[in-house]
Amino acid sequence: MRLFIFLLVAVLLLFQYDFWFGKNGYLDYKRTAQQIAQHKQENEKLSQRNQVVAAEIKDLKQGVEAIEERARFQHDMVKPDEIFYHIVKEQK
């Protein structure tokens, strides 16, 4: 009878070890859940950035103001008979 109880305890310990430390065990599950949460957070940031870029693309395709703004500030372009003043702040 003692041998039987000893074998049952040994099997129970073996299963517990496999549950906690084995492949797809509890620790592996927690690590994977943490990685999933991190990836979801990264995906949310990327989704927000994509929405901003999509809105900018839509504005460039449909509106003249965005194209005009880019031409003025990125390429220093002006309309005919227009004077553009660029004020630079002093650096201390």
From Swiss-Prot:
Disulfide linkage: none
Membrane association type: Single-pass type II membrane protein
Cytoplasmic side: 1-3
Pfam families per UniProt: DivIC
Function: Essential cell division protein. May link together the upstream cell division proteins, which are predominantly cytoplasmic, with the downstream cell division proteins, which are predominantly periplasmic.
Similarity section: Belongs to the FtsB family.
Descriptive protein name: Cell division protein FtsB
